[in-house]
C-alpha cells in the first residue's frame, strides 16, 4: 500500500484553520479538520502518525512533503527521546506529545518506509499526483 500524507494550515478571516489528509493514488482514506490554531508542522506530524496507525500490520510506503515531519522521524526523534523531549535549556520541545505518539506509531505497520517527496510538483509522477491530491484534501478539510 502507498499512502500520501499532507497537512495544511492557513489564516482565513483572522483565524488559523488547519486540516490534514491521508490519500492513496485512487482514494481519500481520511481528511479531517484540526483544532483552530494548529500549525502546519503539527498538522503534518498528525497526518504522518495517523497514516502509520492506519497501516497496522500492513506493508506500507508513506510519502510526506514535510521536511519537518520527515526529519523528525528519521533524524531528530530518537535524540529528543534520549533527552526526555527537552531542549538544551530544559524546556519541553514543541509538539512533544505528537512526537511521542509518532515514535509509538512507527511500530504499527508490519513493514514501513517513510519517504520525502517534493511538494507542489507537477512532474506527472505518482508521488506528485498523490501529494497534490493530499494537499487538496487537507486544505478542504481545514475549511
Feature-to-residue mapping (PLM):
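RNase H catalytic domain
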Residues: 7-15, 27-28, 32, 48-132
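Short glycine-rich loop/turn motifs
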Residues: 16-22
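A short, polar/acidic, helix/strand-boundary loop motif
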Residues: 24-44
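Short, intrinsically disordered/low-complexity patches at protein termini
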Residues: 36, 54, 137-138
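Short hydrophobic beta-strand that contains or immediately precedes a catalytic carboxylate
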Residues: 3-5
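An amphipathic alpha-helix/helix-turn recognition signal
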Residues: 38, 42, 46, 129, ...
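Acidic, His- and aromatic-enriched active-site or binding-groove loops in soluble protein domains
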Residues: 135-143
Amino acid at each position: 500500500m502507498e499512502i500520501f500524507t499532507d497537512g495544511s494550515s492557513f489564516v482565513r478571516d483572522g483565524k488559523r484553520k488547519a486540516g490534514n489528509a491521508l490519500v492513496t493514488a485512487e482514494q481519500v482514506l481520511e481528511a479531517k479538520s484540526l483544532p483552530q490554531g494548529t500549525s502546519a508542522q503539527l498538522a503534518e506530524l498528525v497526518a504522518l502518525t495517523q497514516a502509520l496507525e492506519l497501516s497496522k500490520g500492513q506493508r506500507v510506503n508513506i510519502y510526506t512533503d514535510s521536511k519537518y515531519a520527515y526529519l523528525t522521524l528519521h533524524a531528530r526523534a530518537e535524540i529528543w527521546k534520549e533527552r526526555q523531549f527537552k531542549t538544551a535549556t530544559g524546556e519541553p520541545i514543541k509538539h512533544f506529545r505528537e512526537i511521542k505518539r509518532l515514535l509509538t506509531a512507527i511500530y504499527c505497520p508490519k513493514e514501513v518506509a517513510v519517504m520525502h517527496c517534493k511538494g507542489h510538483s507537477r512532474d506527472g509522477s505518482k508521488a506528485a499526483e498523490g501529494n497534490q491530491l493530499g494537499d487538496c484534501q487537507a486544505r478542504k478539510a481545514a475549511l
